[in-house]
Amino acid sequence: MAYEKELDAAKKAASLAARLCQKVQKALLQSDVQSKSDKSPVTVADYGSQAVVSLVLEKELSSEPFSLVAEEDSGDLRKDGSQDTLERITKLVNDTLATEESFNGSTLSTDDLLRAIDCGTSEGGPNGRHWVLDPIDGTKGFLRGDQYAVALGLLEEGKVVLGVLACPNLPLASIAGNNKNKSSSDEIGCLFFATIGSGTYMQLLDSKSSPVKVQVSSVENPEEASFFESFEGAHSLHDLSSSIANKLGVKAPPVRIDSQAKYGALSRGDGAIYLRFPHKGYREKIWDHVAGAIVVTEAGGIVTDAAGKPLDFSKGKYLDLDTGIIVANEKLMPLLLKAVRDSIAEQEKASAL
């Protein structure tokens, strides 16, 4: 398999970060939640997850130049009054890494932790290799006890070549009730991974179980398709998604879940369509889609903007998008693009009146 060494490191990093997140989610304390300037909640686990991934990748791939594009920086943790939070994160990270032989006996200081978090301040771009991380994708889902993901991808010369999604709360069985992935298991926690040209695989997050190759839904009739969208109305225009679904003839109600767990569920055929149309003025960040995009495309799906253009991850931290992001299989995509085009045109016409 291509990128075998990088994939092993990424799976280890994402799995350990997910273990840290699970520990925090189980005992979520009010003091864990801080407020960032953009009003989205950020947690102790967010910082801890980023530190774990940064430290594991650096150690496992020590012979290579290391560039990480990630969501968090340590600015808030360096402010007065943050010492208790910083020490708590440092302890969590140390406890998590102590389970790994390669880190046994090495204890991080708070300064080590801040440095690890700030390794994620790369800008990305079209040249070289860049790891791309969302340490907790779906922070609001995490805080509610719902879906979230540790999402880690690798860009090489601006192209996505590897992606790992650790989804601690995603059942092994289908979340759409169709049970296409043929699991009757009630086990929870999935790890999805893909490398370019090698397909997408899923396995239980907390076990050495054998990975299973997965495929997107083969549904050709939109009436039989189910579609995913963001749980939070603040993240996506649900009215526009509803209009598109109506034009397609989709009969099933939308499945609304947080985070790139949607991409994982789509890759194994739980749903057939994903619609994401952010509110005007919102700029999509690459860490919200890099890992998920390759997980779906390697499983046979197509990921584009609303005009049908492939997503371009080579422009730095932000995606330069036409309106939104849509995902479907090869058969449904032409029908979906037409429904999207017609619905957007109607919406623009209505707003001009």
UniProtKB/Swiss-Prot annotation:
Keywords: Abscisic acid signaling pathway, Calcium, Hydrolase, Lithium, Magnesium, Metal-binding, Multifunctional enzyme. Its cofactor is Mg(2+). SUPFAM superfamilies: Carbohydrate phosphatase (SSF56655). Adenosine 3',5'-bisphosphate binds at residues 139, 235, 259, 262, 276, 288. Pathway: Signal transduction; phosphatidylinositol signaling pathway. Optimum pH is 7.5. This is 3'(2'),5'-bisphosphate nucleotidase 1. It comes from Arabidopsis thaliana.
